[in-house]
């Protein structure tokens, strides 16, 4: 007789037991970090989209003021009046001065200070800009929303028959430098003559 060998099956021990749970946990952590990063980018992009609209309006308002001033003869001494969306009539002084001899600092004529590169110096406070060379213009927006813009200009007399006009605008309350809320103020210039 043959003795039968009985083989007993040993239960298989699953050495990978629980590894799926660990993989799932790692995947969830990676996903949470990724979604957190995307959320920050999404919020920043929504905010900068709104900022782009304000930036475009700043350019449009600066161009409007520039056109109003340049439409006057270079030797005109009378002020203009510009009415904003709030019904405020702003007086615009168009009298210029030679470089360094007016109220615009050593690089400007009359008006807001200019930097060494010939752009409006936004570090100068609004109150320090001479009267009628700056305004807090209220622009009409969609749905009756109004935004106030800080507009400044400087007029350099080049000769008896010509002058250079520099105009800049930005939303009131925007930071002077850096950050998500920063809007680069457009600086527009033209030569106006007789």
Task: Describe the residue ranges of each PLM region.
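N-terminal leader/signal peptides at the extreme start of proteins
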Residues: 1-19
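General helical secondary-structure elements
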Residues: 4-6, 50, 159, 185
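Aliphatic-rich helix starts adjacent to a transmembrane/signal segment
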Residues: 19-63
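Low-complexity, Gly/Pro-rich coil/beta segments used as flexible assembly/activation regions
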Residues: 56, 60-194
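Short secondary-structure boundary micro-motifs
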Residues: 7, 13, 32-34, 42-43, ...
């Amino acid at each position: 007789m043959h003795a039968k060998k009985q083989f007993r099956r040993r239960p298989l021990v699953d050495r990978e037991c629980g590894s799926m749970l660990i993989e799932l946990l790692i995947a969830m952590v990676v996903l949470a970090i990724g979604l957190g990063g995307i959320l920050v980018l999404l919020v920043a992009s929504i905010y900068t989209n709104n900022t782009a609209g304000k930036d475009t309006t700043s350019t449009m308002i600066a161009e409007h003021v520039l056109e109003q001033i340049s439409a006057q003869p270079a030797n005109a001494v009378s002020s203009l009046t510009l009415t904003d969306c709030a019904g405020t009539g702003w007086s615009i002084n168009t009298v210029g001065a030679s470089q360094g001899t007016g109220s615009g600092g050593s690089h400007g004529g009359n008006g807001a200070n200019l930097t060494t590169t010939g752009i409006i110096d936004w570090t100068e406070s609004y109150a320090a800009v001479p009267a009628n060379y700056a305004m807090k213009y209220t622009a009409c927006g969609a749905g009756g929303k109004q935004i106030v813009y800080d507009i400044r200009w400087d007029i350099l007399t080049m000769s008896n028959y010509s002058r250079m006009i520099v105009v800049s605008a930005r939303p009131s309350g925007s930071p002077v430098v850096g950050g998500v809320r920063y809007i680069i103020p457009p600086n527009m210039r033209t030569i106006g003559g007789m």
